[in-house]
Amino acid sequence: MLTLKIFVYTVVTFFVSLFIFGFLSNDPGRNPNQR
């Protein structure tokens, strides 16, 4: 049970980090002329 909970938390954290990283990477990617 504890292992399953740790696995779930790891997957959730991984997806959240991926979403945040992708959002931050795409933000300046849409405006390459600003910088």
Swiss-Prot record:
This is Photosystem II reaction center protein I. It holds the Pfam family PsbI. GO terms for biological process: photosynthesis. It is a single-pass membrane protein. One of the components of the core complex of photosystem II (PSII), required for its stability and/or assembly. PSII is a light-driven water:plastoquinone oxidoreductase that uses light energy to abstract electrons from H(2)O, generating O(2) and a proton gradient subsequently used for ATP formation. It consists of a core antenna complex that captures photons, and an electron transfer chain that converts photonic excitation into a charge separation. GO terms for cellular component: chloroplast thylakoid membrane; photosystem II reaction center. PSII is composed of 1 copy each of membrane proteins PsbA, PsbB, PsbC, PsbD, PsbE, PsbF, PsbH, PsbI, PsbJ, PsbK, PsbL, PsbM, PsbT, PsbX, PsbY, PsbZ, Psb30/Ycf12, at least 3 peripheral proteins of the oxygen-evolving complex and a large number of cofactors. It forms dimeric complexes. The lineage of its organism: Eukaryota, Viridiplantae, Chlorophyta, Ulvophyceae, OUU clade. The chain crosses the membrane at residues 4-24. The gene is psbI. Keywords: Chloroplast, Membrane, Photosynthesis, Photosystem II, Plastid, Reaction center, Thylakoid, Transmembrane, Transmembrane helix. It is found in: Plastid, Chloroplast thylakoid membrane. Belongs to the PsbI family.
